[in-house]
C-alpha cells in the first residue's frame, strides 16, 4: 500500500484479540455467550420499562436509554468480532471500517455522558428530594437524554471526519479487534497531529468531565447515606452505590487507559485488553448491576411474566 493515499485504500485486516488458532473457538463461544446475555439483558430492560407504566419516571427513562446505548454499543463491535473468530482472514472494507468507527464513537461517548446524567439524577433524588420533581421533570429528563445523543453524534462526526483526511500507506494490519482511532492512526504515513490533539482534548472532555460529575454526585450521595439512622438501610444503600460505582470505574478506567495515556508508552496489545472491558463487559454488566437490587424492576418483571402465563 506504500505511496497510496486514503482514497485508494479498499480494505484493512483486523488482527483480532489473539492470533493463536487453538484459542479462536473458545473465544468465539465465550464472547457469543456474553453477547447473548448483553442483548437479552439490555433489550429486556428497555422493553420492560416502556411496557410498565409505573416505571415511566426520569430514573427509568435514563436506565432505558443506557440499556439501548449498551445494546447498540455492543452490536457495533461484537458480531463482526465473532465472525472474525471463525474466518481465516479478518478483512474489513474501508467504508465498513469508517462506519464501525463512527457508530462506536457515537455510542461510547453517549454512554460516558449518560452515566453522568444518571449519577446527577440520583444525586438530586437523594440529596434534594423536595426539588427533584421540579428540576428533573420529564421535559428536563428528555432534554438531558437528547443532549447526550447530540454530544455523541457531534464528537463522533468530528473524529471520523478528521480520519477521512488521513493517508494510509503503511502495512494494512490493524492491531485490534475493531476499527478504533488509535490503532488506525498507527497505519498513517501523513501528519496526524490534529487527530492526536482531538483525541486528547475530546477524550479529556468525554472522560474527565463525566467522571468528575459522577464522583462529585456520589460523594454527596454517600454523605447523605451516612445520615441514615437505620443500619440496614445504610448497608443497602452502600451496597447499591458500590455496585454502580464498580461499573463506572471499569468503564471510565479502561477508556482512560486506552485514550489518555501518553502515546510513547502506549501498547496496542494492552489497549485491546482494556477495550474489551468498556466495549463488551460493561454493556453486559450494566442491566444486571442497575436492576439486580431494584424492587420496582422485579415487581414489573413478575407482573409481566404473570400476564404472559395467563395469556
Swiss-Prot record:
Q: Which GO terms describe its cellular component?
A: membrane; plasma membrane
Extracellular face residues:
1-25, 76-99, 161-197, 259-271
Annotated localization: Cell membrane
Sorted alphabetically, which keywords does the UniProt record give?
A: Cell membrane, Disulfide bond, G-protein coupled receptor, Glycoprotein, Membrane, Olfaction, Receptor, Sensory transduction, Transducer, Transmembrane, Transmembrane helix
Instruction: Give the top-rank taxon of the lineage listed in the UniProt record for this protein.
Output: Eukaryota
Q: Which residues are glycosylated?
A: 5-6
Any stretches that span the bilayer, and where are they?
A: 26-46, 55-75, 100-120, 140-160, 198-217, 238-258, 272-292
- GO BP terms, alphabetized: G protein-coupled receptor signaling pathway; sensory perception of smell
Cytoplasmic topology ranges: 47-54, 121-139, 218-237, 293-311
Q: How does it sit in the membrane?
A: Multi-pass membrane protein
Q: Is tRNA processing included in the keywords of this UniProt record? A: no
Q: Which cysteines are joined by disulfide bonds?
A: 97-189
Q: Which SUPFAM superfamilies match?
A: Family A G protein-coupled receptor-like
Pfam families xrefs? 7tm_4
**A molecular function (GO) term:** olfactory receptor activity
As for family, the record states:
Belongs to the G-protein coupled receptor 1 family.
The function of this protein is: Odorant receptor.
Q: What is this protein called?
A: Olfactory receptor 8G1
- Species source reads Homo sapiens (Human)
Lineage of origin: Eukaryota, Metazoa, Chordata, Craniata, Vertebrata
Amino acid at each position: 500500500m506504500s505511496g497510496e493515499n486514503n482514497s485508494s485504500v479498499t480494505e484493512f485486516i483486523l488482527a483480532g484479540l489473539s492470533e493463536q488458532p487453538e484459542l479462536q473457538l473458545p473465544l468465539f463461544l465465550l464472547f457469543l455467550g456474553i453477547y447473548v446475555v448483553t442483548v437479552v439483558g439490555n433489550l429486556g430492560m428497555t422493553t420492560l420499562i416502556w411496557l410498565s407504566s409505573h416505571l415511566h419516571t426520569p430514573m427509568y427513562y435514563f436506565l432505558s436509554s443506557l440499556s439501548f446505548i449498551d445494546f447498540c454499543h455492543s452490536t457495533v463491535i461484537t458480531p463482526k468480532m465473532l465472525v472474525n473468530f471463525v474466518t481465516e482472514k479478518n478483512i474489513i472494507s474501508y467504508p465498513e471500517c469508517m462506519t464501525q468507527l463512527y457508530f462506536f464513537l457515537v455510542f461510547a461517548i453517549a454512554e460516558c455522558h449518560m452515566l453522568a446524567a444518571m449519577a446527577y439524577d440520583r444525586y438530586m433524588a437523594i440529596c434534594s428530594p423536595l426539588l427533584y420533581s421540579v428540576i428533573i421533570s420529564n421535559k428536563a429528563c428528555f432534554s438531558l437524554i437528547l443532549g447526550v445523543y447530540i454530544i455523541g453524534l457531534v464528537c463522533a462526526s468530528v473524529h471520523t471526519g478528521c480520519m477521512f483526511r488521513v493517508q494510509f500507506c503503511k502495512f494494512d494490519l490493524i492491531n485490534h479487534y475493531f476499527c478504533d482511532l488509535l490503532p488506525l492512526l498507527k497505519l498513517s504515513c501523513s501528519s496526524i497531529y490534529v487527530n492526536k490533539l482531538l483525541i486528547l482534548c475530546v477524550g479529556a472532555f468525554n472522560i474527565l468531565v463525566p467522571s468528575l460529575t459522577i464522583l462529585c454526585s456520589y460523594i454527596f450521595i454517600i454523605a447523605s447515606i451516612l445520615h441514615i439512622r437505620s443500619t440496614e438501610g445504610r448497608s443497602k444503600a452502600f451496597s447499591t452505590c458500590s455496585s454502580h460505582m464498580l461499573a463506572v470505574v471499569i468503564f471510565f478506567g479502561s477508556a482512560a487507559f486506552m485514550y489518555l495515556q501518553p502515546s510513547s508508552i502506549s501498547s496496542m496489545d494492552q489497549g485491546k485488553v482494556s477495550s474489551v472491558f468498556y466495549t463488551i463487559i460493561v454493556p453486559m454488566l450494566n442491566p444486571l448491576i442497575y436492576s439486580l437490587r431494584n424492587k420496582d424492576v422485579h415487581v414489573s418483571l413478575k407482573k409481566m411474566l404473570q400476564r404472559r402465563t395467563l395469556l
